[in-house]
Amino acid sequence: MTTDDDMRMWDDEAATFDEAADHGLRDPAVRAAWRDLLLSVLPPAPGRVADLGCGTGTLALLLADEGYVVDCVDFSPEMVRLARAKTGDRTDLTCVEADAAAPPLESGAYDVVLCRHVLWALPDQVAVLRRWVDLLAPGGRLVLVEGNWTTGAGLTADATLTLLEEAGRPGVVRHLPEPAYWGREITDERYLVLA
């Protein structure tokens, strides 16, 4: 579970969160890169997606625009408020204020569980992964986008694969060094895991 201090930190970050090229996807080229990446690993739409730790809902909205039905979860009230403002009254996208580590979503109901830059920040990561896998329908896909940043935060790809093995869900890594995803050159490790 996450703490009140964590929640306040992300509430404070919410107003400027989308300024990062890979968060707001405001640059059409960055948005197109993420669209193409996600569509290459997701089953064809329509499908049901749980976007856990959704932030301001940018990826959820991108996927809803592609024909997916998306339930997004974030524990930051301010992030959820901004996500709801972006998504309006769409019927293909809902935003829930809750902890991504223990989302109040139906087991076995999702074709995809998507988490971007979330797992690294959570305690008891193996238990969290097991819960996320429990949300998947038969044949469902767990898609994790993580990194090991120069700030010292994050998880290496190898560490993420080990956690997935411990959770009983082996994965495959695709490294993402291309500036197209981040809006700039990067020197840290960033990757997607499909499990």
What are these regions (language model features)?
Residues 126-138:
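A short glycine-rich, Lys/Arg-flanked "PGG" loop and its adjoining helix->strand segment in the class I
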Residues 153-168:
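Short alpha-helix
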Residues 170-180:
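Conserved S-adenosyl-L-methionine
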Residues 101-112:
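A short acidic, Gly/Pro-enriched loop at the edge of an enzyme's catalytic core
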Residues 112-125:
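A short SAM/SAH-binding and catalytic strip from SAM-dependent methyltransferases
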Residues 48-52, 56-103:
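Class I SAM-dependent methyltransferase SAM/SAH-binding core
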Residues 1-45, 151:
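Conserved class I S-adenosyl-L-methionine
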Residues 140-147:
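Conserved beta-strand signature within the Rossmann-like core of class I S-adenosyl-L-methionine
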